[in-house]
Amino acid sequence: MNGTRAAPGVTPSEVAMNGKNEMEVVEQAPIPKTNANIGLKSPVNTVEDVNQEDSTNSPPPIPHVEINQMPLSMIIRNLTVYTVKEISQYMKTTVHMNTADTSTARKMRFLNLLIFIRNQFLKLYVLIKWCRTIKENNFNIMIDLLNWFRGTNMTVNNCIWALKSTLESTTNAKLPNVDLVTALEVLTLGRPNLPTHDFKLSGENNEYETVNGQLRIPTKLIMQRLKDLNIIVMIKISSIDIPKQFNNYEIRDGRVYITVPGEFEIQLSTIDRHSPFFFVDFKLLFAGTDSLFNKPRLEKIINDVLLRNKKPLYSLYSLLHRYVLTLQLYMIHLELLNLENDGKFSGGNLVHSYNAKKSLIVMKYWRNGKLGNKTKIIIGVDRKSEDLVLKWDNENAKQSMHMPLVYTHVVGNVEAILDEIMFNHSRLIRADLLSRGVFQEDEEDPSVLLFQLPTTCLSTAPIQLKIDLVSGVFYFKNPSPLLLEYVSQINRAETPEDLTSVLQRLKLDKIVHIIRNMFDKTGWVCSKVIKLDNPIATSVNSEEIKTNLLQNDMFIRLASWPVNWYLILTIVSSNSSCIIEKRIGKIISTSGKWKVQYLDTTNVLSLKLESITYKKIISLQKSTLNRIINHTLIDSLNHLKTRNKVCSPDLIVNSLPKHLLEDEVDDKVPHSIENYHHISLITIELESFLEGSKALSGILESTMFLRMDYKKFEIRLYGKFKRSTMAFHCQCDDLLINFVEREPLAFYLAETFTNLNEIVQYLTLFRQKLMQLVVLTDVVERLHKNFASDHFKIISLKPNEVTFKYLKSSTDDKDCTINIITNEQTIKNLTVKLSDKNPQHIIQPFIDNQQFEYQFIFSYLQFTSPLFCCLKEILDESNKEERLENAKEESDSTRTSTSITLGLHNLSEYQLVYFNPELGYKITLILELKEVSINGKKKIQFYVHFSQDEHITTKSSAYPLIHQVRNEIFMLEMKKRDGTPSLIKLDNTRNVIRLGNGISCDSDSIVEVLMSINKILLGDSKSAPQITTVPPTNKTI
């Protein structure tokens, strides 16, 4: 035990208790009021001395102040003027203040102004009231007294500051606290503030010397007392139970020094071995706690615990340990507040909550970053060790065996621990990101993550990504504008997968920026407006593997391209590669949304990013234009519902005829794809192209070829006849078709285009011309088939007109004209016009009014042409005889005349009326077209008979004529008795059937039959008949 030096005359018990000015003392005698206590030399004061002291100690007069004073009226005036100005200024500024403030807020501000002004007047009022209590209302006394108080207060304050500076200067003094306090007591009071027990404190060697009648305390007695107290304390410590935390103690100076490392040191003492311990001094063993606890209150609580408990030291440790933990937790709370408000974590990067009841602090860091803000730090008391610990709650750190999760010795080291935790957390995030293969490690700076970002199609450059350890946000070193746009997205990522996805989008946008820049420099136009609801489906980005891939569709075109047609670049990016697919498509806008109207899914080209160069982009302008034209035609054909197929290059070279590729065929030149790179072929189904016309099935081959020559800007449609047609033998330069020399049956239609937007119009033009050609060929074929004779001849052949002759004895230039009426797209109608001199011209109204097929018209004209020629001959002969007999009419008055009238009810029934007004008879001969069955075959025949409407009796003059026709023409052939035939024999007639009441014959026999009947009916009439023609009626067939 080490001893301490005390002032002479002080007992050991007093020395043990001198550490506190207001400490409770077990044995304390009253201090006598001697002269030595107040520092007087004379032991006794006389009456004269007292009177003299009273006279000399009378208070001096208060210094009078005459400067810096003004009348009270001036003060009241100035205060009134100030009040008026403040109120008026408030009224003016209230009008221009924020209108969003409520009326209650404005009223509260005005009320605060009034209270402030009222307080100023109230101070002045109170001052006046105080001054009235002074004799004669002398204000100067009040002013002088206030000035004296200020001066005195300044002196006292200076002394206090001097003492504080002295106390700070003695902080590092090597004297014990007890001796230091005793020295200060001696310095300020002239003696220690301890009970003397009637001893005079002195350091002289004379033990029996008296001072003012009191003996000095001997030094040996003081030392002996301290030794006795040490023995008493040692015996008492040994006789009671102490906790293991109190094993580190030291007994000296009459007290026991108990030290708990890292927590506190407490000094206890006692009077004897039967008395309990009492508090002497307490000291915390960590810095910054001088102003955090109240030592007098702690002394009272500790003495109460030592007095009342059976195991005082156990209870004392439990109390002080809990007190220290609470104090340490509160100190950590204050330190965290300082770090959050004014320290390195200011700005909301660190937030904590302090729960004093649960002795718990929960911290959350990296509040501005989403990736690591879900972890937290907990500071509290460990249940096992009952020590203050800091626990880092992080799932990834728990799996790592090399990172601490629990920290002790937290007090004073909070900032360092937080720095270590944030550094370890950044290492975890960095290791997680490196394991995904997206980043690379920087050898120079381990805290940097390198991400390879393309700068061109062939080169990449690393960008440096770091984590700010204070805020937890990611940032790029030397960022570009594009990187700055993605920093906020990176910091909003909540998982490493999200962060990787953001970086992949960054890489994809950089690739898009590079490609767009290359296309812009070479004259392309990149559309930034088109946004599809669903991305283009690709072969790379399928459903099975699309989770790790990102896609962006670019729509690029040239200004000269057809409207709405684009080169679509589909960029599919992954962690390690980038694939670009090229397609041709047509994009339209409907109802405010972009939609793909046509997309080429067959000729999809896939390229790597490294293979794209400026040379290839320039070559795309020509090759893509060719494909655009192809797909424009394909799209147009699809709209026309025409089945089509694009011919592959191999098919073009190896399988197709050479005349489809070259105008002048040269067998010596070998086929190669390079020779025909400027030519594309599309096969077309003929029937769908001509909208299902059946007339072409026997004329043209079912497959046609549409050829595009991009070098000559020419479009051709190739076709082929199935067989040689009669149209080939006709001279027609206006057909606008070109025949192939080496393929007699092959032909083509050709047009030259200058505007790409008008290519679709050529399909309509080709379809119109082709339909016109088919119809024209079919008409010519049917004409030759129906009018197959030596006297049939096509006079003129034009695309819309066919003129021909088919009558045997025709003297006109043409007998019939067929006009093909077309509109802008298709064949509308066919019209048949008979010439005016044509014997069949009488049926023209029926042809015009009824919509007959031209095949029926041709067959009808051919079948009835002998009939109408015969009728014309009968009428012309009668007309000639009429002119000859007109001259003899006056001389021969006894002649009778028979008139012949031709009438048409419809195209299947005609009548010849023989009328003789002199003899008073009328004979009607009916000619009908009927379908009959001959030997099981149905044929069209003429049926000639007399009308049943006219009742001719035997007395009529016409009866002999009718009877003769029936007997000689209509009746079956019978022989007379002498063996001669009883009927007239019809020469050159075949297929004649006598029916008794009439006769049936074909077109070849109708002339002979009709001429024989006409001869009989005119046989008895010696006069020329009067011939008239009745206009046809509107009856239908």
UniProtKB/Swiss-Prot annotation:
Q: Which organism is it from?
A: Candida glabrata (strain ATCC 2001 / BCRC 20586 / JCM 3761 / NBRC 0622 / NRRL Y-65 / CBS 138)
Subunit architecture = Component of the Mediator complex.
By its UniProt entry, which PANTHER family does this protein fall under? MEDIATOR COMPLEX SUBUNIT (PTHR12809), MEDIATOR OF RNA POLYMERASE II TRANSCRIPTION SUBUNIT 14 (PTHR12809:SF2)
Its GO CC terms?
A: core mediator complex; mediator complex
Described by its record, this protein's role is as follows: Component of the Mediator complex, a coactivator involved in the regulated transcription of nearly all RNA polymerase II-dependent genes. Mediator functions as a bridge to convey information from gene-specific regulatory proteins to the basal RNA polymerase II transcription machinery. Mediator is recruited to promoters by direct interactions with regulatory proteins and serves as a scaffold for the assembly of a functional preinitiation complex with RNA polymerase II and the general transcription factors.
Recorded protein name is Mediator of RNA polymerase II transcription subunit 14
Q: Give the record's GO biological process terms.
A: negative regulation of transcription by RNA polymerase II; positive regulation of transcription elongation by RNA polymerase II; positive regulation of transcription initiation by RNA polymerase II; RNA polymerase II preinitiation complex assembly
- What is the protein's major site of localization? nucleus
Which branch of life, at top level? Answer: Eukaryota
Q: Which GO terms describe its molecular function?
A: RNA polymerase II-specific DNA-binding transcription factor binding; TFIIB-class transcription factor binding; transcription coregulator activity
Q: Does the keyword Transferase apply?
A: no
Family stated for the protein in its record: Belongs to the Mediator complex subunit 14 family.
Q: Provide this UniProt record's keywords sorted from A to Z.
A: Activator, Nucleus, Transcription, Transcription regulation
The places in or outside the cell where this protein is found are: Nucleus
Cross-referenced Pfam families: Med14
Classification via InterPro entries: Med14_N, Mediator_Med14
